[in-house]
Structure formats: structure tokens, C-alpha cells
Amino acid sequence: EKYRASVILMGYEQIGCDAINVGQYEFGGGEEFLLETAGTTQIPFISANLINTQTNQLLFNPYIIIEREGLKIAVIGLTNLLPKTIKNIRADNFITAGKSMIKKVKDKVDIIVMLVNANRADQKTLTKEFQEANLIFTSGSTSLTRPMMNQPEKGPYLFSTGRESRYINVTDISLKNKTDPIINISFLEASQQYNQRKLDRLQDTFPDQTLEDAYKGQGNILSLIEKSRTSIIQADVQLKEAVNTLIFKNVALDSKIIDDQEVLEFVSTSLATCNQLKN
């Protein structure tokens, strides 16, 4: 298992990785192995709430600041899933720690990203607790975020990759200024499509009539029609007025993905070594 962990880290280095949030599974080999591993890589390990109980200091840097095309992006790491078997490390309240770090970096950066390792129940309050963040990426739950899922209108937006890395979240942000909110146009477009499908299904039953004539006297359906049309119009207005935008999609890591031959060779060799070690 320690070999597996080390080659996963080598794989991250090969494909490119800006930071690793230390959570539940990073402690799979024990705290000593984690610290040794963190010292062998150029990838920053981050955590804003894991404390060395012997020194009462943070175990890792709480965040990193990444610069991309003139933008400064703060990435803050948090967890509340520290294994009980870990003795010399404690996890301080991750909400309190997260808010403290947001306050510390918000005037220094353009975008704040939270990496949060927490169970599903604790993830439900993250957008309310971290309102000054822009993006929240979670682990620790098998839930998968889809574009149509409800999100706060102006963020922060929360995304989860689901079970066993079967998908990868891809989030593209276009930032034209630093004052307007970031608008999730993927949600607005998905909402429009969903409401249009409802109208189309109703229309298919009576193709030669208007919806008003077809469902005359059926108050519930007429109300649904009105709500769907209003939602489509409102989404269209928001799309046209959006200045800073976010596009989100899940990419399935299936056979349609074309393998990078160098990475494929590395993975195949590593798996073969793992199998040899098992035997």
C-alpha cells in the first residue's frame, strides 16, 4: 500500500498537480509515512486545520496562492475526517479554520478555492459557511455534482466528483473584472433545457394546439407551463447579463478517453509491481 501511495504521487507529478489537501486517505499509511511522503515531492501538501499536538503548530501550510494569467488564486485545504488511529495530530474545527483563512487571504487574491474533505452531512452547510469563497471542491462523499443541481445564484459553487474517481470535475472560469459575481452559466443552460423539455412533452400530446388551449381548465398544468416559461426567460436574461462566467462539466474517465502513452506505460509498470509485491 505504501508503494501504491508513492506511485500515485509520482503520477500526480507527471500529469501536473498544484496542491494536495490532506484528508482521511492520506493517513492510510500512518502519520510518519505521510510526513515522509510529503517531503519527497514538489507538490504542496496543504491543511488549514491539522495540528501537530507536540508543537501545537499546523502540520502543513494552510493554503497556497497560484498565479494564472495575471490572476491570483488561493487554495485552502480542510478536513474533518482525521482517522481515530492518528495519535499525534488533531483536527481543529474545519469551519472555524476555513473562515479564518478566507479572512486572511481575501484581500490578496482574486479567487478563493476551498478543498474540503468531509462527510456528506457536513458538506451541506459549506456554501453558507464559506460565503466569501468562490469554489468549493469536496471529497469524503460518493455524491456527484451535476450541472442541473441547485447552487447559490452567485456562489460559492460546490462540486463533488462522486464515487471512485469515475469522473473528473472540469471548471472553466472567465473573469473579465474583479467586482461582478461569477455566474454559473452551466446551471442556467441546464435549467433552460430542463424546462424546455417539460414544455415540449406537454406540446407533443397536442401538436396542433397552443398549450393554453390544450390544457384549458387544468390549473396545475397551466401553472407549470407559466413557471417553466418564466424560468426560461429569467435564465436567458441572466446569461445575457453575465460578465464573469463559470462553465462546469463532469468528464467520465472511461474508454473514450485517449490514453497518454507515457502515463499509460507508467501506470502499467506500477500495477505490475504492485501485483508482484502482493505475491
Show where each model-derived region lies.
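Acidic, metal/ion-coordinating pockets
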Residues: 1-279
